Amino acid sequence: MKNIFRAIIALLSLACCTPNDGVDSLARVKSFKEEINKETELPSITYKEFLDNIYDFEHDSTQTWSNKSGRPVVIDFYATWCAPCKKLGPSLLELSDKYKGQVDFYKVDTEKEERLAMAFNISSVPTLMFIPKEGEPYLSVGYISKGEINQIIKELVKY
């Protein structure tokens, strides 16, 4: 019994003597997660970037929709708390890799970019906006499968 008690005391002493870098480790993990997220997320687009690069609806209501890159665009309007949005994210990321150089993909956090979401009457998430090279965009409200999105993108790329 004395030996068990001594072993417990020895282990506790060792535990107390080890440096506590838990806060530093937590900061490193958080930084690492942020780096991973940067590489595994679609680029965000702000209200101003949308006006500058896709469609300046504030100043010219007759302007045609276009992306300065000349490619079709897919925009994911989402919210961080939305489970279907989180489920949709990896599919969109895979499709953005598949159509790299052919279609531009962006995401819009509807809580951070309320003005942009309100401009298109986005009231439900997820909502995907598909903008062809020419013509009017169209919206898909609610979760849709990767296969369905792929079919829509194939149509966008045709024209």
Task: Indicate where each model-derived feature is located.
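Short active-site neighborhood of thiol/selenol oxidoreductases, capturing the structured segment around
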Residues: 64-80
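Loop/turn elements at helix/coil->beta-strand transitions in domains of secreted/extracellular proteins
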Residues: 70-73, 101-104, 133
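Thiol-based oxidoreductase modules, predominantly thioredoxin-like and allied folds used
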Residues: 77, 88-96, 100-114, 122
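Hydrophobic heptad-repeat coiled-coil signature
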Residues: 82-85
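Non-catalytic, surface beta->alpha helical segment in thiol-disulfide oxidoreductase systems
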Residues: 124, 129-159
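N-terminal targeting signals for export/organelle localization
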Residues: 1-51, 159
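Structural signal for short hydrophobic segments within the conserved structured cores
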Residues: 43, 104-106, 137-140
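Acidic, low-complexity mobile loops and tails
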Residues: 42-58, 68-73
